């Protein structure tokens, strides 16, 4: 859930076009509480982002360290920015997350697998889902606004990924 600083930042209530900034995916301003925001009694450091392009998925791994004095939980989030296109595209989309519990000073390697078929989007002109090849930005952080790591990776996609179970 995203809390905007002002109602003036939202499109009219009867305008359901999300590309006009209705969600964190398209909103470009500063918000009061960004999507994924949380509080903690400790601090976490992210490092060593590794991204590997596989045939059916993209493997994202990074180190997460509890740099504070207390044990705590962190919900590490992975967002993806799609390659630049002519049509309106999301600023970023949440594609994975993991809740990690760490003791003070503890370090852990976090690995998330992002299925390539979930990177597709609906192309209005083609009237179908497409998975464009190109430069994807992999974004890792504590919320949609608290970005700690990012890396651009060239991804080879195909348009014929099987549909997920929920779409059959």
Where are these regions (language model features)?
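Intrinsic-disorder/low-complexity, polar/charged segments enriched in Ser/Thr/Lys/Arg/Asp/Glu/Gln
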Residues: 57-59, 107-111, 148-150
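Secreted, periplasmic, or luminal enzymes acting at the cell surface/secretory milieu
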Residues: 1-73, 79-81, 133, 138-141, ...
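Electropositive phosphate-/nucleotide-binding environments in soluble metabolic enzymes
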Residues: 40, 103, 130
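Short, hydrophobic/aromatic beta-strand segments
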Residues: 71-78, 90, 122-125
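Short, surface-exposed ligand- or partner-binding patches at beta-edge/loop junctions that are enriched
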Residues: 113-144
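Detector for glycine-centered tight turns/loop "hinges" at secondary-structure junctions
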Residues: 68-69, 85, 127
């Amino acid at each position: 859930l995203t809390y905007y600083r002002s109602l003036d930042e939202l499109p009219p209530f009867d305008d359901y076009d999300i590309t006009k900034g209705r969600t964190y995916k398209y909103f470009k301003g500063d918000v009061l509480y960004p999507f994924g925001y949380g509080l903690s009694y400790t601090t976490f450091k992210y490092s060593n982002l590794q991204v590997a392009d596989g045939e059916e998925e993209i493997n994202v791994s990074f180190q997460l360290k509890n740099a504070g004095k207390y044990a705590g939980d962190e919900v590490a989030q992975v967002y993806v920015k799609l390659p630049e296109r002519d049509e309106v595209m999301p600023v970023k989309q949440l594609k994975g997350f993991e809740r990690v519990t760490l003791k003070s000073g503890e370090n852990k390697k976090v690995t998330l697998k992002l299925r390539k078929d979930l990177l597709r989007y609906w192309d209005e002109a083609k009237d179908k889902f497409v998975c464009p090849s190109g430069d994807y930005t992999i974004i890792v952080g504590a919320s949609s606004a608290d970005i700690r790591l990012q890396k651009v990776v060239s991804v080879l996609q195909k348009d014929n990924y099987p549909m997920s179970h929920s779409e059959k």
